[in-house]
Curated annotation (Swiss-Prot):
Known EC number: 1.14.15.28
Keyword line: Cholesterol metabolism, Heme, Iron, Lipid degradation, Lipid metabolism, Metal-binding, Monooxygenase, NADP, Oxidoreductase, Steroid metabolism, Sterol metabolism
Name of the gene encoding the protein in the UniProt record: cyp142
Protein name: Steroid C26-monooxygenase
Enzyme class at the top of the EC tree: oxidoreductase
Needed co-factor(s): heme
């Protein structure tokens, strides 16, 4: 581990910062020397665990309504709302994410995991991202939303395009692609909403169409935005934690072997996978008043990035944070955020991670990286993780008829 001695000259909006392998060294300098850091363009960033929590505990000063991305305005979905509007919308959407609804998916998610492994198990090799990690959450979310299996690839592409649009510099081409994708998604979603109003089913679309809190229901446009948030949030984050976390298990063979021998160690491993990968790199809050925050002057109207990944490697909270340890306890990471905006889908994400990792450990116990080359990361400033991860294993027979 090298120690950065000079102030990092970085652009926190440039996706390459999160993908070139230097971010965590830069974070270390920021936490030690400038807990609320300004990058080369003047963008403020809360980098310590305490600074992130302090901002999240004070939404009156650190508002979500200006939008969670540094260079884009707020959108009409709950992640860009403050309470009480946020709380009302959250209650409406939460009807589709109750513990019972999530646990009712155990068998179907388990079958899906086996189906994905069955598709590659006889080959003895696959791309873990493309073949295992990426299809799982999209299929789960697609199933919950009630979309047809044939429509999942389309949803996956829309999700990728939208996240890339939210995670990159805004230029005319990016804006146009974002608008085209959103228009296609809106047309698709409104058609589904119309069908569910006429013939309700038990899927998430039907729940959102018919859920009511304090006498209020969501409009069609509100359902479009909230399902879009569910699609993006449920896809990318779980995908990157599964692939990036599995990479670390494979690079720490003693810990992989311990899990193969004792699956009861898995809950701790899942939490360390979440901390280590920190797939949501940051979110922004907008200052409602001038203040001095952890030694840095902030102005009303400016945005500050809450650096969740940096917080998850804060030495004052996590002992030996740069070592991956499945026995880490306590592990109070903020991979799902903190406070009123704590991730609504955290139970579903943990379930998917557990069910797939259980099966990979059992069915592909000698899984290993195809080579020692670094796993390439997606150059994105919002949600980032492995782009590709070739793996090899001893071929085996499918388990589903």
């Amino acid at each position: 581990m090298t120690q950065m001695l000079t102030r990092p000259d970085v652009d926190l909006v440039n996706g390459m910062f999160y993908a070139d392998g230097g971010a965590r060294e830069a974070y270390r300098w920021m936490r030690a020397n400038e807990p609320v850091f300004r990058d080369r363009n003047g963008l403020a960033a809360a980098t310590t665990y305490q600074a992130v929590l302090d901002a999240e505990r004070n939404p009156e000063l650190f508002s979500s309504t200006g939008g969670i991305r540094p260079d884009q305005p707020g959108m009409p979905y709950m992640i860009d709302m403050d309470d009480p509007q946020h709380l009302l919308r959250r209650k409406l959407v939460n009807a589709g994410f109750t513990r019972k609804r999530v646990m009712d998916k155990v068998d179907s998610i388990g079958r899906l995991c086996d189906t994905l492994i069955d598709a590659v198990c006889e080959r003895g090799e696959c791309d873990f991202v493309r073949d295992i990690a990426a299809p799982l959450p999209m299929a789960v979310i697609g199933d919950m939303l009630g979309v047809l299996p044939t429509e999942r690839d389309m949803l996956l592409k829309w999700s990728d395009d939208l996240v890339c649009g939210l995670s990159s510099h805004v230029d005319e081409a990016a804006i146009q692609k974002l608008m085209d994708t959103f228009a296609a998604y809106t047309e698709f979603t409104k058609d589904v909403i119309t069908k569910r109003r006429a013939e309700p089913t038990d899927d998430l679309f039907s729940v959102l169409v018919n859920s009511e809190v304090e006498g209020q229901r969501m409009s069609d446009d509100e359902i479009v935005f909230e399902t879009l948030l569910i699609l993006i949030g449920g896809d990318e984050t779980t995908r990157h934690t599964l692939s990036g976390g599995t990479e670390q298990l494979l690079r720490h063979r003693d810990q992989w072997d311990a899990l193969v021998a004792d699956v009861d160690l898995l809950p701790g491993a899942i939490e360390e996978m979440l901390r280590w990968t920190s797939p949501v790199k940051n979110m922004c809050r907008t200052l409602t008043a001038d203040t001095v925050f952890h030694g840095t002057e902030l102005r009303a109207g400016e945005k500050i990035m809450l650096m969740f990944e940096s917080a998850n490697f804060d030495e004052s909270v996590f002992g030996d944070p740069d070592n991956f340890r499945i026995d880490r306890n306590p592990n109070s990471h903020v991979a799902f955020g903190f406070g009123t905006h704590f991730c609504l889908g955290n139970q579903l994400a943990r379930l998917e991670l557990r069910l797939m990792t259980e099966r990979v450990l059992r069915r592909l116990p000698d899984l290993r990286l195809a080579d020692d080359a670094p796993v390439p990361l997606r150059p994105a400033n919002f949600v980032s993780g492995p782009e590709s991860m070739p793996v090899v294993f001893t071929p085996s027979a499918p388990v589903l008829a």
